Amino acid sequence: MAGTPHTELSPELLAHMQAIKAKASEYGLDFFEVVYEVLDFETMNQIAAFGGFPVRYPHWRWGMEYEKLSKRDAYGLGRIYEMVINNDPCYAYLQESNSVTDQKLVMAHVYGHSDFFKNNLWFSKTNRKMMNEMANHATRVRRHIERQGMETVERFIDHCLALEHLIDPHSMFMAREEPRRVSGSDDAGGFEPHKLPSKGYMDPFINPESEMQRQRDAHAAEVKSGKGRIPERPTRDVLLFLLRHARLDEWQQDILSIIRDEAYYYAPQGMTKIMNEGWATYWHSKLMTQHFLEAKEIIDYAEQHSGVVHMPPGGFNPYKIGVELWKEIERRWNRGQHGAAWESLDSIGQKEAFDDKSMKGREKIFEVRRIYNDVSFIDEFLTPEFVDRYQMYQFRKDPQTGEVRIVTRDFDRIKQTLLFQMTNMGQPFLYVVDGNYMNRGELFLSHQFVGLEIDASKATQALKSLRALWGRPVHLMIRVNEDNWLYSAAELNGEPKREKVGEDLPKPAHGLM
């Protein structure tokens, strides 16, 4: 794909941008400076294929994504109106074929996103100079390609990408260290003694064999006594465990660290999709309808906005659910419809009519914007009335008639299913529970069941990539239909084998399921 041709805002768009920015600030939005670039649809698709960045490391996935976006445009199945990057300053891309009305809507939307990026707790640990960091990642990967060859590096990246979701987003807010290091060597059940840095010819003097053997003996004694378990506790950040304990070459460690860093950068976006898109939609709606929409633009705006928030029966549109839930929170706190006094009212009619004129809605939504993610947002503020109003029921298509039918209207079941799907961004919880399984240097992972079963086909693919990176047999215990199954990848590039877990299975260092 080509470079990144771009144009600056026209004088007309610049004037609109300055007015929208000033009004957004008056409302209390606190955003990073936003740099706008106007792109043609081809360049827009290129950057979208790169995940919103103009430069990424070489890999076939970007070309595949570009082809998908180009075909979508060609068949009229949709187009990208805007992209905004969590960076300081934020970078926002506008489609040059958009009307002026569309561009104003997008700019108002972007300031909502930028405010959310800057102030939401879950974004607070992200790299605010990721535009530069992505370019740095690309340079490093190209350097490895020059030395190792494109095919070798690309194959390794494929394995890393198959595991990119095996991180622990909450660990950014906690200190979780794993000081012990293990390798796939045969000595002492896979233990690798700690060595001081030294040049090759000095190594026997700096790291004498007597000291290496002392460490091996001490480790063996710990293992025998049960104190030397690796990891010391179940570890959710599988990529970090691999970086610290797998036998990887330096170039492989560098690439795996790049994939992990980028996964952590994108994680908060997955954790706050409903809140973030709803927040941006709330503000573009308020700014446009109350301040920047001219009479001649009403129809165009209504058409564009309705497209953004359209949600068919059985569908789930984060823009729609997000914006309506933000409005609902504001309405309830404006009227005091929360707390013990309101909860004690007997009837739905009394609750709906209650109004203490407290007008705390705006204050409340800014508070929620600061500290919540999608799981806590839905858990605390979704109500049965909201589910009924927007028909957030569970639907299923009848295989015989093709009709979409309601499966359940039960609020608790609907809410629980939503929370299951949002927890960990819909990805399974996998933990490393033993890095030296059966004292053979094998890796054992376990799936923590939280209501939704793991996709066995995806699990086996991830297992094959884990086997490639670990260098020794890898095992994964998962739950399927109330039974526990063990998937084992013993041979490199071989298909994992499956067996039902029985009482005779040797126990890993830690239990989980």
PLM segments and residue spans:
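Post-HExxH zinc-binding segment in Zn-dependent metallohydrolases
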Residues: 115-186, 277, 281-293, 307-318
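Well-ordered beta-sheet/strand-loop patches within structured domains
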Residues: 139-142, 158-248, 252-256, 319-412
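Aromatic/His-enriched, Gly/Pro-containing loop or helix-boundary segments
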Residues: 4-9, 73-74, 79, 83-102, ...
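Short pre-active-site segment immediately N-terminal to the catalytic Zn-binding motif
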Residues: 69, 89-106, 267-275
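Fold-level signature of zinc-dependent metallopeptidase catalytic domains
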Residues: 5-9, 13, 94-97, 117, ...
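Long, internal scaffold/assembly segments composed of regular secondary structure
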Residues: 224-323, 327
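Auxiliary, metal-adjacent structural segments of Zn-dependent hydrolase domains
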Residues: 3, 11-90, 212-246, 250, ...
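Non-catalytic terminal regions of proteins
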Residues: 97, 101, 220, 293, ...
